Amino acid sequence: MKNWIVGMVALVTMVPVMAATPWQKITHPVAGSPQSIGGFANGCVIGAQPLPLESADYQVMRSDQRRYFGHPDLLNFIHRLSAQTHQQQLGTVLIGDMAMPAGGRFSSGHASHQSGLDVDIWLQLPKQRWSQQQLLKPQPIDLVAVDGKRVIPALWQPQIESLIKLAAKDNDVTRIFVNPAIKKQLCLDAGADRQWLHKVRPWFAHRAHMHVRLRCPANSLECVDQDTPPPGDGCGAELESWFQPPPPSAKPGKTLPPPLPPSCQALLDNHFATE
């Protein structure tokens, strides 16, 4: 679990309810050439686009929360992945949170997903399309056993591994966060084709979905990428460390969000000045 303290604020995707943020008051994308700005956990996006809610290959959950916006690169990835999934007859891809219309910090649910390059994709592939009621109030399938050390065999399906593998092999994808037990199962099942596994990173929670992160777009000059994952498949000592008791440490104090990138602060200032 190396460097987990450093990465905690930036990467954890399920966080306690936070105070309301001004970003959720921006109801439409900011006009302009698409630009992802700042980091994944402290940024925004100009020229975001909404993911079309109607598709033969995927369905969008909780559309009433309006978290289905992203940089065009993210939309293109979702279309590619869902088309490949459909072609292989794996099932319908279920799309969870992406970003808000201008990106920025959510009031609840995530610390990242701020620059329009993150998407949550559920690890279930229904053969029958969900009803509108199911999409608005989706029921996740927890794939991980109570002890957190393994997946539940009755729930683990080969299609899930195929979905994760397809995403990991996409050139625009830099990281996929899953529960350590899911990563462990992928390591066991991968066979000789293992190069894609280094993109699949163990992380807290993520028991029913994968969190896919894309690289900074080439023309987004203010976008801040993460360092590339370490070489190798990540199936050795690093993965095993996640199943060890954490070292004792002092109770962490409350932390304030870091200052926004100047361009994101200017975006907020300009938006609310013209209201």
Curated annotation (Swiss-Prot):
Cofactor(s) listed: Zn(2+)
Class of this enzyme: hydrolase
Record's GO cellular component terms: outer membrane-bounded periplasmic space
EC nos: 3.4.24.-
Entry binding sites for Zn(2+) 2: D147
One GO-annotated biological process of the protein: peptidoglycan metabolic process
Keyword Lipid metabolism: no
One function term, GO molecular function aspect: metalloendopeptidase activity
Region (Disordered): 227-262
Composition bias, Pro residues: 244-262
Compartments (UniProt record): Periplasm
Main location group: periplasm
Signal peptide positions (record): 1-19
Cofactor stoichiometry and binding remark: Binds 2 Zn(2+) ions per subunit. Zn(2+) ion 1 is bound in the active site. Zn(2+) ion 2 is bound at the dimer interface by residues from both subunits.
Binding-site list for Zn(2+) 1: H110, H113, D120, H211
Keywords (A to Z) from UniProt: Disulfide bond, Hydrolase, Metal-binding, Metalloprotease, Periplasm, Protease, Signal, Zinc
Superkingdom per UniProt: Bacteria
Pfam family, one: Peptidase_M74
Cysteine-cysteine disulfides: C44-C264, C187-C235, C216-C223
Subunit structure: Dimer.
Function: Murein endopeptidase that cleaves the D-alanyl-meso-2,6-diamino-pimelyl amide bond that connects peptidoglycan strands. Likely plays a role in the removal of murein from the sacculus.
Family: Belongs to the peptidase M74 family.
Protein's recorded name: Penicillin-insensitive murein endopeptidase
Species of the source: Yersinia pestis
